[in-house]
Amino acid sequence: MEVLPRILLFDSGVGGLSIYHKIKKSLPKANYHYYADHMASPYGDKDDEWLDHRINRILIQLDQALTPDIIVLACNTASTLSLESLRSNITTDIVGVVPAIKTASEKYQAETIGLLATPATIEREYIENLTNKYSSNKTIIKVGSTELVALAEEKLHGGEIPDTSLHRIITPFIDANCKHVVLGCTHFPLLKPELQALAPNIHWIDSGEAIANRVQHRLGLSANSGSDKMKPQPETTGSNFYSSAEITDKLQTYIKGIGFTKVKSHYLPCI
Protein backbone atom coordinates (compact mmCIF):
# COMPACT_ATOMS: atom_id res chain seq x y z
CA MET A 1 0.00 0.00 0.00
CA GLU A 2 1.23 3.46 -0.87
CA VAL A 3 2.30 5.38 2.23
CA LEU A 4 2.07 9.13 1.77
CA PRO A 5 4.58 11.47 3.42
CA ARG A 6 3.72 13.36 6.55
CA ILE A 7 4.95 16.93 6.57
CA LEU A 8 4.99 18.97 9.79
CA LEU A 9 5.10 22.76 9.43
CA PHE A 10 5.81 24.99 12.42
CA ASP A 11 5.40 28.74 12.85
CA SER A 12 4.51 31.32 15.47
CA GLY A 13 1.15 31.79 13.74
CA VAL A 14 -0.42 31.61 10.29
CA GLY A 15 2.62 32.92 8.40
CA GLY A 16 3.82 29.43 7.55
CA LEU A 17 0.64 28.89 5.55
CA SER A 18 2.37 30.84 2.78
CA ILE A 19 4.91 27.99 2.71
CA TYR A 20 2.20 25.34 3.10
CA HIS A 21 0.44 26.57 -0.06
CA LYS A 22 3.63 26.20 -2.10
CA ILE A 23 4.49 22.75 -0.75
CA LYS A 24 0.92 21.49 -1.17
CA LYS A 25 0.99 22.62 -4.80
CA SER A 26 4.09 20.47 -5.31
CA LEU A 27 2.92 17.55 -3.15
CA PRO A 28 -0.90 17.61 -3.12
CA LYS A 29 -1.29 14.05 -1.83
CA ALA A 30 0.87 14.44 1.29
CA ASN A 31 -0.52 14.51 4.83
CA TYR A 32 0.10 17.89 6.45
CA HIS A 33 0.31 18.84 10.10
CA TYR A 34 0.65 22.51 10.94
CA TYR A 35 1.47 23.90 14.37
CA ALA A 36 0.88 27.59 15.13
CA ASP A 37 2.32 28.81 18.43
CA HIS A 38 -0.19 31.64 18.75
CA MET A 39 0.27 31.73 22.52
CA ALA A 40 3.80 33.13 22.10
CA SER A 41 3.23 35.09 18.89
CA PRO A 42 4.89 37.20 17.63
CA TYR A 43 8.30 35.57 17.94
CA GLY A 44 10.10 38.65 16.63
CA ASP A 45 10.15 40.49 19.97
CA LYS A 46 10.94 37.59 22.33
CA ASP A 47 14.13 36.89 24.29
CA ASP A 48 16.40 34.60 22.28
CA GLU A 49 17.21 32.12 25.05
CA TRP A 50 13.60 31.81 26.15
CA LEU A 51 12.37 31.42 22.59
CA ASP A 52 14.99 28.86 21.58
CA HIS A 53 14.07 26.73 24.59
CA ARG A 54 10.36 26.95 23.80
CA ILE A 55 10.78 26.09 20.12
CA ASN A 56 12.95 23.08 20.93
CA ARG A 57 10.63 21.74 23.62
CA ILE A 58 7.52 22.05 21.44
CA LEU A 59 9.09 20.52 18.35
CA ILE A 60 10.71 17.65 20.25
CA GLN A 61 7.25 16.76 21.59
CA LEU A 62 5.56 17.18 18.20
CA ASP A 63 8.19 15.05 16.51
CA GLN A 64 7.59 12.25 19.00
CA ALA A 65 3.79 12.54 18.82
CA LEU A 66 3.33 12.96 15.07
CA THR A 67 6.41 11.11 13.69
CA PRO A 68 6.71 13.31 10.59
CA ASP A 69 8.91 12.38 7.64
CA ILE A 70 10.15 15.96 7.45
CA ILE A 71 9.78 19.14 9.53
CA VAL A 72 9.53 22.54 7.88
CA LEU A 73 10.49 25.33 10.24
CA ALA A 74 8.22 27.77 8.41
CA CYS A 75 9.31 30.81 10.41
CA ASN A 76 12.27 33.02 9.61
CA THR A 77 12.82 34.08 13.21
CA ALA A 78 12.77 30.48 14.45
CA SER A 79 14.99 29.31 11.59
CA THR A 80 17.70 31.91 12.11
CA LEU A 81 17.63 31.30 15.87
CA SER A 82 16.98 27.59 16.45
CA LEU A 83 17.70 25.55 13.32
CA GLU A 84 21.11 24.41 14.57
CA SER A 85 19.91 23.46 18.06
CA LEU A 86 16.88 21.64 16.65
CA ARG A 87 19.03 19.54 14.35
CA SER A 88 21.13 18.49 17.34
CA ASN A 89 18.01 17.43 19.28
CA ILE A 90 15.81 15.91 16.56
CA THR A 91 16.82 13.21 14.07
CA THR A 92 13.96 13.92 11.64
CA ASP A 93 15.08 15.96 8.63
CA ILE A 94 14.43 19.68 9.19
CA VAL A 95 14.17 22.34 6.49
CA GLY A 96 14.54 25.94 7.61
CA VAL A 97 13.33 29.14 5.98
CA VAL A 98 15.69 32.08 5.64
CA PRO A 99 15.28 35.35 3.72
CA ALA A 100 15.96 35.01 -0.02
CA ILE A 101 18.88 37.46 0.05
CA LYS A 102 21.14 35.17 -1.97
CA THR A 103 18.48 34.74 -4.69
CA ALA A 104 17.73 38.46 -4.84
CA SER A 105 21.40 39.39 -5.02
CA GLU A 106 22.26 36.88 -7.74
CA LYS A 107 19.13 37.25 -9.85
CA TYR A 108 18.80 41.04 -9.91
CA GLN A 109 21.44 43.58 -10.81
CA ALA A 110 19.97 46.35 -8.68
CA GLU A 111 22.38 48.28 -6.47
CA THR A 112 19.80 48.46 -3.69
CA ILE A 113 17.85 45.57 -2.18
CA GLY A 114 15.30 45.81 0.60
CA LEU A 115 14.78 43.39 3.47
CA LEU A 116 11.45 43.43 5.29
CA ALA A 117 11.47 41.13 8.31
CA THR A 118 10.85 41.04 12.05
CA PRO A 119 13.24 43.07 14.24
CA ALA A 120 14.72 39.84 15.63
CA THR A 121 15.52 38.50 12.16
CA ILE A 122 16.94 41.84 11.03
CA GLU A 123 19.33 41.92 13.99
CA ARG A 124 20.40 38.29 13.80
CA GLU A 125 24.11 37.61 13.11
CA TYR A 126 22.99 35.03 10.55
CA ILE A 127 21.48 37.82 8.42
CA GLU A 128 24.61 39.94 8.71
CA ASN A 129 26.70 37.01 7.50
CA LEU A 130 24.24 36.34 4.67
CA THR A 131 24.32 39.92 3.42
CA ASN A 132 28.10 40.16 3.74
CA LYS A 133 28.52 36.96 1.73
CA TYR A 134 26.07 37.61 -1.09
CA SER A 135 25.33 41.35 -1.07
CA SER A 136 28.55 43.04 0.01
CA ASN A 137 28.50 45.22 -3.11
CA LYS A 138 24.90 46.31 -2.62
CA THR A 139 23.05 48.69 -0.36
CA ILE A 140 20.67 46.76 1.88
CA ILE A 141 17.73 48.69 3.30
CA LYS A 142 16.43 46.83 6.35
CA VAL A 143 13.00 47.40 7.85
CA GLY A 144 11.93 45.45 10.93
CA SER A 145 8.25 45.16 11.79
CA THR A 146 6.19 43.05 14.19
CA GLU A 147 3.15 45.14 13.30
CA LEU A 148 3.09 43.55 9.85
CA VAL A 149 2.95 40.11 11.48
CA ALA A 150 -0.12 41.21 13.42
CA LEU A 151 -1.72 42.58 10.25
CA ALA A 152 -1.21 39.27 8.43
CA GLU A 153 -2.78 37.42 11.35
CA GLU A 154 -5.65 39.91 11.35
CA LYS A 155 -6.27 39.34 7.64
CA LEU A 156 -6.76 35.60 8.03
CA HIS A 157 -8.88 36.15 11.13
CA GLY A 158 -11.24 38.17 8.93
CA GLY A 159 -10.14 41.69 9.87
CA GLU A 160 -9.57 44.75 7.71
CA ILE A 161 -6.04 45.77 6.74
CA PRO A 162 -5.57 49.57 6.77
CA ASP A 163 -3.57 50.85 3.81
CA THR A 164 -2.17 53.65 5.96
CA SER A 165 -0.41 51.17 8.24
CA LEU A 166 1.07 49.19 5.36
CA HIS A 167 2.21 52.34 3.56
CA ARG A 168 3.93 53.67 6.67
CA ILE A 169 5.85 50.41 7.10
CA ILE A 170 7.10 50.24 3.50
CA THR A 171 7.80 53.98 3.09
CA PRO A 172 11.61 53.53 3.51
CA PHE A 173 11.66 51.31 0.41
CA ILE A 174 9.53 53.71 -1.60
CA ASP A 175 11.62 56.72 -0.58
CA ALA A 176 14.82 54.90 -1.59
CA ASN A 177 13.32 53.91 -4.96
CA CYS A 178 14.02 50.29 -4.06
CA LYS A 179 12.76 47.93 -6.78
CA HIS A 180 13.36 44.56 -5.08
CA VAL A 181 12.35 43.76 -1.50
CA VAL A 182 12.91 40.40 0.18
CA LEU A 183 10.03 39.34 2.42
CA GLY A 184 11.99 37.93 5.35
CA CYS A 185 9.03 36.67 7.36
CA THR A 186 6.64 33.95 6.24
CA HIS A 187 3.68 36.06 7.38
CA PHE A 188 4.44 38.77 4.86
CA PRO A 189 3.62 36.93 1.58
CA LEU A 190 0.06 36.67 2.92
CA LEU A 191 -0.08 40.45 2.44
CA LYS A 192 1.56 40.46 -0.99
CA PRO A 193 -1.64 41.54 -2.84
CA GLU A 194 -1.96 44.57 -0.57
CA LEU A 195 1.75 45.38 -0.82
CA GLN A 196 1.69 45.12 -4.61
CA ALA A 197 -1.34 47.39 -4.79
CA LEU A 198 0.38 50.05 -2.67
CA ALA A 199 3.80 49.75 -4.35
CA PRO A 200 3.36 48.20 -7.83
CA ASN A 201 6.90 49.15 -8.87
CA ILE A 202 8.44 46.97 -6.17
CA HIS A 203 9.10 43.27 -6.76
CA TRP A 204 8.29 41.47 -3.51
CA ILE A 205 10.45 38.34 -3.19
CA ASP A 206 9.75 35.34 -0.96
CA SER A 207 11.28 31.89 -0.61
CA GLY A 208 8.11 29.78 -0.76
CA GLU A 209 8.77 28.01 -4.07
CA ALA A 210 12.41 27.34 -3.19
CA ILE A 211 11.35 25.73 0.10
CA ALA A 212 8.73 23.60 -1.66
CA ASN A 213 11.35 22.37 -4.13
CA ARG A 214 13.74 21.57 -1.29
CA VAL A 215 11.11 19.59 0.61
CA GLN A 216 10.18 17.61 -2.48
CA HIS A 217 13.85 16.89 -3.18
CA ARG A 218 14.58 15.84 0.42
CA LEU A 219 11.65 13.44 0.37
CA GLY A 220 12.65 12.11 -3.04
CA LEU A 221 9.11 12.38 -4.37
CA SER A 222 7.38 13.39 -7.57
CA ALA A 223 4.32 15.61 -7.36
CA ASN A 224 1.65 12.91 -7.05
CA SER A 225 3.52 10.07 -5.44
CA GLY A 226 4.05 8.49 -2.08
CA SER A 227 6.92 6.20 -1.18
CA ASP A 228 7.40 2.86 0.53
CA LYS A 229 10.30 4.53 2.36
CA MET A 230 7.98 6.78 4.38
CA LYS A 231 7.29 6.03 8.03
CA PRO A 232 4.12 3.93 8.52
CA GLN A 233 1.37 6.16 9.95
CA PRO A 234 -1.94 4.31 9.83
CA GLU A 235 -3.67 6.04 12.75
CA THR A 236 -3.51 9.72 11.82
CA THR A 237 -4.06 10.22 8.13
CA GLY A 238 -5.34 13.50 6.76
CA SER A 239 -4.17 17.02 7.51
CA ASN A 240 -4.49 18.69 10.90
CA PHE A 241 -3.99 22.24 12.18
CA TYR A 242 -2.97 22.86 15.79
CA SER A 243 -2.75 26.15 17.67
CA SER A 244 -1.41 26.77 21.16
CA ALA A 245 -4.16 29.37 21.73
CA GLU A 246 -7.77 30.06 20.77
CA ILE A 247 -8.45 30.92 17.13
CA THR A 248 -11.48 32.65 15.64
CA ASP A 249 -14.30 30.93 13.80
CA LYS A 250 -13.33 32.80 10.63
CA LEU A 251 -9.77 31.49 10.79
CA GLN A 252 -11.04 27.96 11.42
CA THR A 253 -13.26 28.26 8.34
CA TYR A 254 -10.31 29.50 6.28
CA ILE A 255 -8.04 26.70 7.52
CA LYS A 256 -10.58 24.00 6.68
CA GLY A 257 -11.08 25.59 3.28
CA ILE A 258 -7.41 25.12 2.34
CA GLY A 259 -7.25 21.42 3.05
CA PHE A 260 -7.08 20.80 6.80
CA THR A 261 -9.66 18.31 8.03
CA LYS A 262 -9.25 18.98 11.74
CA VAL A 263 -8.50 22.17 13.68
CA LYS A 264 -7.48 21.98 17.33
CA SER A 265 -7.06 25.04 19.58
CA HIS A 266 -5.18 25.24 22.89
CA TYR A 267 -2.95 22.33 21.89
CA LEU A 268 0.31 22.73 23.77
CA PRO A 269 2.76 19.84 24.11
CA CYS A 270 4.42 19.54 27.51
CA ILE A 271 7.11 22.22 27.56
List PLM regions with ranges.
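Non-catalytic structural scaffold of enzyme domains
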Residues: 1-271
